Amino acid sequence: DYDSMDALKKATDKPLIIINESMQFSAGVNLTYTMDFANKGDFKSIEKFIKYFQETCKHLKYSEHPVISAPSGLTLGGGFEVMVQSNFVASHTNIVVGLVETIVGLIPAGGGCKEMLARWLDTEEAKKDPNYAPLKVFDIIGYGKTATSPVEAEPMKYLRPSDKKIMNRNSFCLLYTSDAADDRVS
């Protein structure tokens, strides 16, 4: 919703840790919210909402300060797109992560496609074959593939090798004080 996006955009003027105290990080955009606009034929509002989400993700990606995401539970769709813009991720071992929009006939719109392609282009296979990365990303996103743990998420490039994996949710904030964030986030 707009309130969440406003809070994220405004918070990028300082080091930021994105965490949700509930069991789920984010299952993505509330589709009922956007369907209400569609049912009324108000497609301008949908366009405005998507553009605002894209701008929010861009603020996270290009913040002058470290942005750390601490996902747990469901981290899907727009939730993944928020996480993937972060400089660093400290993921709980109980995570379900992925871009699942295609399962409901949508295309990820918050930068997830771009970030996935960038991660896959950085592989040895992609350096040998220019078709490798786009086909791999198309397969993952097109089928709405999810990973159900950090162990599964890393080879799918949902998580990077440098991202932390944490078993105890109470450890998230202990890992990163603002001083530690400046030292650990590149």
List each model region and its residues.
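A structural preference for short, pocket-lining loop segments at secondary-structure junctions
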Residues: D1-K44, K51-A70, H92-V96
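Anionic group-transfer/hydrolysis microenvironments
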Residues: E21, T32, L74, I103, ...
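Single, functionally critical "micro-switch" positions that shape active/binding sites
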Residues: V29, S86, A181
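Conserved catalytic cores of soluble enzyme domains
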Residues: I46-I50, Q54, K58-S178
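Single conserved hydrophobic/aromatic residue that forms the stacking wall/gate
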Residues: D179-S186
